[in-house]
């Protein structure tokens, strides 16, 4: 290995390997109508009526304040085009994580998906979990190809043993340069409930809520047949209420994305790094904000997401 590659960050090397893997898939296929050009940002492109797709996601989240931290989140999804304007899906969510001296003041801190676990401050911890089952519906009101701008509404309920969520989105899309340049924006409002220790009642647990409010944007340019590349920006906010009050965290992420869409399949990879723009809020956990980055249990330094789908 050259000195240059030896010192390259691991997430960057992994993204490079994924790009080379996708390049080996060939260049002669025709892109499908609903191919997912972004890892985190949704577009208004839907499956045609009667079309079906199996999609697999894998997200790696890496590096906290110090110590050891890795989390893998998986999603296995089946999608169906009810009509040219309505798409539905059903999927399973699962996760694995490990942590050691990664949190505020050097304490071992599990990620949010495992926040119901009681872990000692000096423990070497790891665990796997079935998070829950999700349903999804996307209804497109406007198409960027016939109306000049795309507009769609998204709803996704999730139910699991210790987790509940109702995620909603407004999706906007605008294309330029004969549809070679795709831009998209998502607004997300997602109240969620976790079954956690109840601070007011010793030895008891209760459903406790928070709300995620996110503003995400992306652009992608088709630079060759079936190939596109661009950037994604993810801005996440957490509130200990159902409205814009009692904010605990805000994180800002930015990075490249690359996409290959074949006749019957696609693969997309997105790498994000947290930007040093975070600030303390009224409910921010003490010690979680370091050098302008937030490292509470749902925030980390790097994220790498790979999505692959097959159409039939």
Q: What are the roles of these predicted feature ranges?
A:
Residues 28-30:
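Membrane-interface motif at the C-terminal end of an N-terminal transmembrane signal
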Residues 32-311:
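Transmembrane beta-barrel domains of Gram-negative outer membranes and organellar outer membranes
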């Amino acid at each position: 290995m050259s000195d240059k590659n030896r010192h390259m960050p691991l997430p960057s090397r992994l993204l490079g390997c994924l790009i080379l893997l996708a390049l080996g898939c060939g260049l002669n296929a025709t892109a499908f109508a609903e191919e997912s050009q972004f890892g985190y940002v949704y577009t208004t492109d839907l499956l045609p009526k009667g079309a079906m797709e199996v999609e697999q996601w894998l997200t790696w989240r890496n590096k906290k304040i110090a110590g050891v931290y890795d989390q893998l989140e998986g999603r296995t999804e089946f999608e169906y085009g009810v009509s040219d304007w309505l798409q539905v899906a059903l999927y399973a969510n699962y996760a694995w994580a490990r942590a050691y001296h990664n949190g505020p003041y050097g304490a071992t801190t599990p990620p949010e998906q495992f926040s119901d676990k009681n872990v000692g401050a000096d423990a070497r911890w790891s665990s796997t979990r079935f998070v829950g089952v999700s349903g999804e519906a996307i209804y497109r009101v406007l198409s960027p190809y016939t109306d000049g701008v795309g507009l769609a509404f998204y709803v996704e309920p999730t139910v699991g043993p210790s987790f509940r969520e109702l995620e909603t989105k407004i999706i906007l899309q605008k294309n330029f340069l004969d549809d070679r340049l795709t831009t998209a924006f998502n607004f997300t409002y997602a109240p969620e409930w976790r079954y956690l220790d109840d601070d007011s009642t010793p030895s008891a647990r209760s459903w406790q809520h928070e709300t995620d409010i996110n503003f995400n944007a992306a652009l992608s340019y088709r630079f060759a047949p079936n190939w596109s590349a661009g950037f994604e920006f993810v801005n996440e906010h957490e509130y200990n209420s159902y409205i814009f009050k009692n904010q605990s965290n805000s994180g800002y992420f930015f990075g490249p994305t690359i996409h290959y869409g074949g006749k019957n399949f696609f693969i997309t990879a997105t790498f994000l790094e947290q930007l040093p723009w975070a600030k303390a809020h009224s409910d921010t956990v003490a010690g979680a904000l370091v050098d302008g980055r937030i490292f509470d249990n749902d925030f980390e330094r790097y994220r790498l997401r790979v999505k692959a789908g097959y159409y039939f």
